[in-house]
């Protein structure tokens, strides 16, 4: 926990200016304003701000009268600010974390707290079908690099209050946002506790490779079991189906993929089209792929070994040998 804000407005502003290093960081903007005769300032990240929303809020703030200001910042956020996504922060670390995530922070003289206005708009690409995970049937949308859009794509498919999306962070410096998606009444509680414990125990400075870095921290590499411990998908319908089956889907900010935990060999060989076939047909196709993969893995090296050592070939398999003309 960092230091808490005080009632001294100038002290709060000076501390934030020093920590944010405004003289060097050109993209962190501080704008001084006056609200109902009081000194105030807003901090925001250039490129993350939805300007149309901020213009409306500033227009409202400029029209406020002194008698309309409540005694506390919490009352200001609850009853005065005409915006839905408003929060109150009293801890300096919380303010810095939210500000560097794109939240606009408002400091107002006479309050010992900061008002957070979530007016952010991330640079992003449009929702489109994944290039490496296409399906002949079904939806044509896919995950993007913006975390809240990915959670919305899952919420759109599972409209149940039992669907939980638990927010976590990892990385001391990067403070990467992570969301665990699962059904309250179907998830394996023991697995969920273990997964949350391992994420909380991560001591890395940053998750530079998103889910790949997270996966390496969660699972230790063991030569005894070489099979994958998780599955990646870029399709919201496949992720939603996995959640309804009792699995946990891990979403990481800045990544267009979802990590499904736990998984099995049969999950690795399935394709998105399998969900749109009857259960018997889908199971048959998955079993066929698994058998083909197993045969390819075992039969090819066995044939090469017997070809190089013909004396090992039994008589009933002599027909596989290549005979000279």
Could you tell me what each predicted segment is?
Residues 1-293, 315, 319-322:
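Membrane-embedded alpha-helical signal segments
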Residues 302-316:
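Membrane-helix interface motif
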